[in-house]
Amino acid sequence: MWLLALVVAYLIGSIPTAYVVGRYLYGFDIRRRGSGNVGATNTLRTMGTIPGLVVLGVDALKGVLAVLLGQALGGPVLVILAALMAIVGHNWSIFLEFQGGRGVATTAGALLAMAPLALFWAFLIWLAVVIFSRYISLGSIVAAAVAPFLVIYFHRPWPYVLFTFVAAALVIYRHRPNIKRLLAGTEHKLGERS
């Protein structure tokens, strides 16, 4: 049963929301526009606010659904494994030849279901960084780095702490191109369209 749950979680995560919105509503492949990332930020930049928010919401829902699947079929260990599989699916989608997003929204959705107070404070940190720097990627990196410590602070179960460390590492790892652009001074700021 666990194996089936993990496969289903991966497939849920693999649904390429930004690609589907770009291809079927706007007539282009988001992997060929903007940063090439299949996620909410690139959707915001290439398609606008409403599509960006839709992609953000659906991608977060993938994380929530994975946690609920894990809770329905097992305990905390299956919860974190299913959530991680959804993030892996989002980042390396079987439907896009193992291309995908950065995992921020899917991770946030999983945290919403596991540790909502930690997510709330991580969001406030993300928001502060974005407001002051105007870099969404920097906000995501900082929020990811802080999130595991917020989960510890709010006394969530150890599997959730472990999940958050691994998920944060995945988010930061997937932001490698953004980190290079931040260091080079070529990263797009909030409000700049691609």
From Swiss-Prot:
Positions of transmembrane segments: 1-21, 64-84, 112-132, 135-155, 156-173
Span of the signal peptide: none
Catalytic reaction annotation: an acyl phosphate + sn-glycerol 3-phosphate = a 1-acyl-sn-glycero-3-phosphate + phosphate
Pathway noted in the entry: Lipid metabolism; phospholipid metabolism
EC number(s) from the headed UniProt entry: 2.3.1.275
InterPro entries the record matches: G3P_acylTferase_PlsY
Membrane topology qualifier: Multi-pass membrane protein
One GO MF term: acyl-phosphate glycerol-3-phosphate acyltransferase activity
Pfam families the record matches: G3P_acyltransf
HAMAP family: PlsY
Family per similarity comment: Belongs to the PlsY family.
Free-text function comment from the UniProt entry: Catalyzes the transfer of an acyl group from acyl-phosphate (acyl-PO(4)) to glycerol-3-phosphate (G3P) to form lysophosphatidic acid (LPA). This enzyme utilizes acyl-phosphate as fatty acyl donor, but not acyl-CoA or acyl-ACP.
Subunit annotation: Probably interacts with PlsX.
Protein name listed in UniProt: Glycerol-3-phosphate acyltransferase 2
Protein's organism: Moorella thermoacetica (strain ATCC 39073 / JCM 9320)
